[in-house]
Amino acid sequence: MAITASMVKELREMTGAGMMDCKKALTATEGDMDKAVDFLREKGLAGAQKKAGRIAAEGIVATCISEDEKHAVVVEVNVETDFVAKNEKFQTYVAEVAAQAVNTQAEDIEGFMAEKWALDPSMTVKEKLSSMISIIGENMNIRRFAKVSEENGIVVSYIHAGGKIGVLVDVETDVVNDAIKEMAKNVAMQAAALKPQYTTRAEVDADYISREKEILLAQIMNDPKESQKPQKVIDGMINGRINKELKEICLMDQTYVKAEDGKQSVSAYVAQVAKENNAKVAVKKFVRFETGEGMEKKEEDFAAEVAKQMNA
């Protein structure tokens, strides 16, 4: 198939590899984006993780928690400019959207938009959005929301950088006091700062681990020095790298950012607080929203540059 400039641009943003390397990878894999990423990784030309995409959209993330702290929601609402994102009217509106979403029965944005606007039942959520677009003077979009409930504990939230990042953490616990709440808040801050992909290793798909091992083996075999090592040593290298990656992408395995010794894991920190409060505690899940993740603004000049180099 024909390899287009936009395909090269997308692969470059996902991997950080050079444009011509991206074109070569796409050509070799007949335009299959996922296979092209693996191709570059095997050649040592891309990072270990796909990048979700440049953070380019404006807006804010907001959270809302029920009075009993057992139900919470995180929402993202986008606008065109950072100037409007800081506008008081816009921020008040986003808080109202979050307050509506924490009580919604809708399972997706389409259903949510069709609901009656709680503060004015004469209009729907969608109609209220249209009204706000007229008032604000910019296009706006309620992009997504996620709800978390915990009947046997609490849900806590954390907002970072004025709404750039929002996190919910589901904590199952038989003791709810200030110490447990502070621990949960610290875990939410951890998730905001270090961007884990999973709560625990148990959530990581076995096929993902298997594919990572294949890629690591290919990298080693492509290295003249490393490939000469005994198989037992190579297996140890692969398992060591996998373990290191899991410690980076799994929240409970990460090094706790406030650890006094610089070594304590999040899991160990939670266990410590639980013991100090004679409580049974389990961090069951987290949800992390970052404003604009996976979205980007148009960059016609860059696309033209890619096209020019491809046709050279």
Q: Residue locations for each model-derived region?
A:
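N-terminal assembly/interaction segments in proteins that build large macromolecular machines
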Residues: 2-312
